[in-house]
């Protein structure tokens, strides 16, 4: 873990074959990162811009684009999982996430089946199957957890989504523990998206003469507190979408501000590099009272957070589907 004192972990939200063979190993060995996450947008960039994949595609013998995509993705995930296995074996995270086909986000059975299949194909115990936090996704999370499969619940914007994930993991872990009482529970993370709130709302807040760059942090803190209060032993809060795109914020702002006890932060590679340049101190999450007061001000500014949650979730699902379909067209 990046900070053992408060059990704060830093993971890298990036995966690419050349990176896995060099810089990735150095970051692990130096104790900077202890996990890695991926998504269709990350794989799209890697598969369509890096020369290293062309030979694999040429020699794959596979006809269908999705089969080629899965071959490339599972190879990268397995390489990463192998390099992180020592961390995993020592109880120091070591997890690697791969997302199911995002076009299945409303189909619980298909999501579950694909998660089981991908987990089996990669055949590494430190793989997490990444599932969007939709209603169908909650069912799949419970089903996979009950089978002993680690899950990364993704695209969490609202407290209600987080509670759905917590209920699913609690149910799945209970079913698994009943079948295998002497076996450790599968691990899960609830990925709370952060920076997208500020990119969406900051201009409106400026027009109301309100501080910017805070909605994402306060919303993340609210959900983090829910997760910590639930106190499920195998579930942690993970902060995602923590890169800064333009504006006046320092590049590692969302990592430094969310360096909470027992939390994970997955950040783009450039953000990770920026973060380790200067020592960072752990922080305490704001109290429920302070968070509620903050969102009362936001409400008075005419911002409907429920509408914001819905917009960001729809945009997130669409972005992953677009990236996934663009990969398939390119392959």
Which residues make up each language-model segment?
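N- or domain-start disorder-to-order transition segments that initiate the globular core
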Residues: 1-23
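Catalytic beta/alpha-barrel core
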Residues: 13, 125-134, 149-161
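Active-site-adjacent beta->alpha loops and helix N-cap segments on the catalytic face
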Residues: 21, 107-113, 131-145, 158-169
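Glycine-enriched alpha-helix->loop->beta-strand junction motifs that scaffold or abut catalytic
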Residues: 32-34, 140-151, 170, 185
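Conserved, mostly hydrophobic/aromatic
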Residues: 39, 98, 129, 144, ...
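Catalytic alpha/beta core domains of metabolic enzymes, predominantly
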Residues: 150-270
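Flexible, acidic glycine-rich loops studded with aromatic residues
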Residues: 233-330
